[in-house]
Amino acid sequence: MSGMWVHPGRTLIWALWVLAAVIKGPAADAPVRSTRLGWVRGKQTTVLGSTVPVNMFLGIPYAAPPLGPLRFKQPKPALPGNDFRNATSYPKLCFQDLEWLVSYQHVLKVRYPKLEASEDCLYLNIYAPAHADNGSNLPVMVWFPGGAFKMGSASSFDGSALAAYEDVLIVTTQYRLGIFGFFDTGDEHARGNWALLDQVAALTWVRDNIEFFGGDPRSVTIFGESAGAISVSSLILSPIANGLFHKAIMESGVAILPLLMRPPGDERKKDLQVLARICGCHASDSAALLQCLRAKPSEELMDISKKLTFSIPVIDDFFFPDEPVALLTQKAFNSVPSIIGVNNHECAFLLSTEFSEILGGSNRSLALYLVHTFLNIPTQYLHLVADHYFYNKHSPVEIRDSFLDLLGDVLFVVPGVVTARYHRDAGAPVYFYEFQHPPQCLNDTRPAFVKADHSDEIRFVFGGAFLKGDIVMFEGATEEEKLLSRKMMRYWANFARTGDPNGEGVPLWPAYTQSEQYLKLDLSVSVGQKLKEQEVEFWMNTIVP
């Protein structure tokens, strides 16, 4: 720990704590680390099938609480503490609709710790092999959770299995959500994108402190799913995140996803006027509105956010200097090795709740109406969409299946493939996958026609079948599913180590070159080429010329 900054008086605190640990006994086994902000004590766990213990450090603050005048503001660094921090319990969730969280646990057959929500929520959890200490220089994988920027937390994911099996450090993060994470006034008073700036703050903390837990700050891989993957893709595009990470994995989400960015101008002004009226601020300008909103209770703002959309990023000329497509076209982004992937039935169930009326079957007119209203496809293009997706489809089931495929193509497959091409053409190594295996444990909770739905791959990536703590990610996995999980853990960790997912014990994963080969992740892994070539061609050259 040579060269490490230690706050005056900490040596005495440390000595007293060690003495107490010796007297009490069990605390002597607790892992202890020093950071630039103070000492932390974690706890130890094990996972199924591995003899490697894992140190867990939970609820470590990476920024100051965004309360009072710091609400709707770029996060400030966390302050050093003189006391020993007990990092053994999960942090509170960022404000979100807790009913959604309960519902998702039932639908996905997962279980999370029961936690309260708070605006004081800028914390992260660290999972490290027990042998890791300052100087170990293990690869670091920083996870950004998904949830449409409206829900999610660091404590819905357990990195113990990945840490134990693959000898890497896992950091799970959480960031402000909804109105707390994205409110903006469209001017200098509140630029917005607070959630994305929280992520930059988390990565800055990792850069400055992860070495004390055994991680290598020069080998940081950021990864996420859905909104977490959009976050990863956005961080690649942002100049203020340059140098904070070195590899990136995007699972089912990229920054050019349609409908992602809030339109500027009159629509934003209208939203602000409605917001002022609902909350009783009656503000005459954005500075006054901001002052009024900062005085409102958290619960009141949470209720307001259910009536208005404040959960999407904006072009703020700071985090996003330009539109994502423009930045990709100009090659004005951080060109790092990347894995990009999708599931083969992204919109079949979890994301189709808005279209529940068609899950039993649909007709052509209803399907085209939904394409027009939900995806904002102009009416003059609808006949082209109909010819491509619904030609010679007559039964309600056929039309439903084509409609769900269309949604997945527009929202995930085409943006993912296009982003992979931009990254490839910028000279960075790219690897693409399509996840194809529906978890068998979900057979009785969703329709039989559903294949690999949105988020299905997460339990495999995290080795959920091998966890035995209070975060349950994969109950009832078959032996074949456990083998697939081990392969995916190895691919992801190999990539974190070297920027290449290939290595001993896993089938070859070809790079995404001009031939556009990709990996089909199923119980039997294989290689495909030009994923959905005709659909990508249709949307890129016919609808978006």
From Swiss-Prot:
The kind of enzyme this is, by top-level EC class, is hydrolase
Q: Where in the cell is it found?
A: Secreted
Q: Which positions carry the signal peptide feature in this UniProt record?
A: 1-28
Transmembrane segments annotated in the record for this chain: none
Stimuli inducing this protein: Strongly down-regulated in cats suffering from tubulointerstitial nephritis (TIN). Excretion decreases immediately after castration.
Q: Would the keyword Nuclease be found if you checked this record's keyword annotation?
A: no
Q: What does this gene product do? A: Carboxylesterase present at high level in urine that regulates production of felinine, a probable pheromone precursor. Probably acts by hydrolyzing the peptide bond of the felinine precursor 3-methylbutanol cyteinylglycine, producing felinine and glycine in cat urine.
Q: What is this protein called?
A: Carboxylesterase 5A
* Organism ancestry: Eukaryota, Metazoa, Chordata, Craniata, Vertebrata
